[in-house]
Amino acid sequence: DELVVNISGDGSFQMCQQELGTLKAYDLKVINCIFNNKNLGMVRQWQDLFYDKHYSHVDLKHGSPDFVLLAEAYGLRGHKPETRADVDEIIKTAIEDEAATVIDFPMAYEMNVWPIVPPGASNMDMMGVDNCTLTSKQRETPDFDWEQV
């Protein structure tokens, strides 16, 4: 009975897009928001930040499906905003609709995701969380209140 929203990049969505069949088979309403930058974004970002821009197998410009048509092939709803003005109406429609929905949000190819964990680092050493630095005492406290950050 709760609203369920899946936020995914286009690369990760393609790793489990067959689950659209599960949504249809069990009549589950999930709003799938795909942030589509036409590449394996986190892998590309790692290669950009840590491997001197030696890009390998991250470009999806010529190998991605039309996600709207893919949703419709499963009998689900599919939307792709063409302008910023379309976004609010599409989201409103998806929330009101009884069917599962795929929304393909176009993003800039170079757009990065923050925070990110550098290679070999722990989740406690994320980059891009300057305002969320934990003290060693907070790291040891299992019931740490993130509202204090």
Task: Give the positions of each predicted feature.
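Thiamine diphosphate
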Residues: 1-149
